[in-house]
């Protein structure tokens, strides 16, 4: 893949050991990769001690770019310019398919966070984490519960593939 080229979006299929057909539910989301001063923006759910890239589900009538901008504002209070669509991860967990689209984003402004009640309950907090520390955090995916194992493997895969470019 050539950096800056939107022609090739790498698609990765990831199957959890818990996956069982048929797929009964699917969810499409967009996530932002935001790097600044060798730190990556992550969302930390303090109550579960779970990290992930900021992002969330695409709402009806919303483009991927609109979803990514909205989610970064809601979860981190950041206005971003949405760049290249880097990766699509198809996560097969239990009887569900989670489709995560990752975009390279750049901060262009600061606004107000607007967390959902669930995100508030989970203690969602944006954190700038050293890239090497983020890789180390996500490398422990095998030590997680099945749903978090898949999430951490997804994040570990994306971060490593991004750094290979």
How would you label these PLM feature ranges?
Residues 35-74:
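Conserved Nudix-box catalytic region and its N-terminal flanking loop in Nudix hydrolases
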Residues 45, 82-85:
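Residue-level detector of beta-propeller blades
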Residues 49, 120-165:
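Nudix hydrolase/Nudix homology domain
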